[in-house]
């Protein structure tokens, strides 16, 4: 996506992120419902004098924040489009903005395979196409570009770590920190992995347990 190189990662530049948060007038928190989901950033977000706005589609948003929330939309990017178009009109959406919004809608719905049964979602995608969205380019960047270490990490998990309970329709994938380090894990390398076991007949629940530094992350589908 255009300008993604200008995004600042807390993992890579923590001091710069802290400075920006301290100097901010307003902080937007997208696709999570509480500041507690900020992880390592939480303390710095809370300490900032800036106002905080949550834009999210998950249930039970933090009532202490300014909240724009709708659990009926497919994704936060769908909600973001609605907010933007209501404030500035549809003409605010450039081809680059359309690409960014479609990327969020597509990835948050598993390629429009879940959480996307409402006609509104497809009407918004039509609006994005009219705004200049290059859908084929986005699909290629999301689904057809991999690095070798990511493929090997996913292959190892599916071959050696995936467990399916024969009594209950549950698949479990435990992933250790040592395995992440062995395959040079980078943020995003496990994106979508938790959905794969759901393609197995009779598996209704998929659980991914990922050991991170100082915490364990559980992902459910």
Predicted regions mapped to residue ranges:
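Short glycine-rich anion-binding loops that position phosphate/pyrophosphate groups of nucleotides
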Residues: 32-35, 58-60, 177-178, 212
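Structural motif
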Residues: 25-28, 51-53, 205
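N-terminal small/polar loop signature for handling phosphorylated ligands or for N-terminal nucleophile
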Residues: 1-47
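Short glycine-/acidic-enriched loop or helix-start segments at secondary-structure transitions
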Residues: 37-40, 64, 218
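Hydrophobic helix-and-loop "lid/oligomerization" segment in the mid-to-C-terminal part
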Residues: 1-3, 18, 23-24, 109-221
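Active-site regions of enzymes building and remodeling cell-envelope glycoconjugates
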Residues: 4-9, 50-52, 65-70
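Short alpha-helices
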Residues: 55-124
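Redox-cofactor binding/interface segments in oxidoreductases and associated redox assembly factors
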Residues: 29-31, 56, 208
């Amino acid at each position: 996506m255009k300008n993604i190189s200008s995004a600042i990662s807390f993992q890579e530049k923590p001091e710069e992120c802290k400075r920006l948060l301290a100097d901010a007038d307003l902080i937007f928190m997208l696709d999570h419902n509480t500041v507690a989901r900020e992880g390592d950033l939480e303390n710095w977000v809370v300490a900032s004098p800036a106002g905080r706005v949550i834009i999210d589609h998950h249930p039970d948003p933090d009532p202490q924040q300014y909240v724009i929330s709708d659990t009926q939309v497919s994704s936060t990017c769908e909600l973001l489009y609605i907010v933007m178009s209501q404030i500035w009109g549809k003409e605010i959406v450039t081809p680059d903005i359309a690409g960014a919004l479609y990327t969020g809608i597509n990835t948050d719905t598993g390629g429009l395979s879940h959480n996307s049964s409402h006609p509104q979602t497809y009407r918004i995608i039509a609006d994005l196409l009219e705004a200049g969205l290059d859908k084929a380019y986005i699909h290629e960047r999301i689904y057809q570009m991999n690095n070798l270490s990511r493929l090997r990490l996913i292959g190892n998990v599916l071959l050696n770590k995936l467990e399916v309970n024969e009594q209950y329709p549950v698949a479990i994938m435990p992933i250790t920190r040592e395995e992440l380090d062995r395959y040079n894990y980078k943020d995003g390398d496990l994106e979508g992995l938790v959905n794969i076991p759901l393609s197995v007949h009779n598996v209704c629940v998929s659980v991914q347990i990922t050991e991170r530094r100082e915490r364990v992350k559980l992902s459910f589908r």
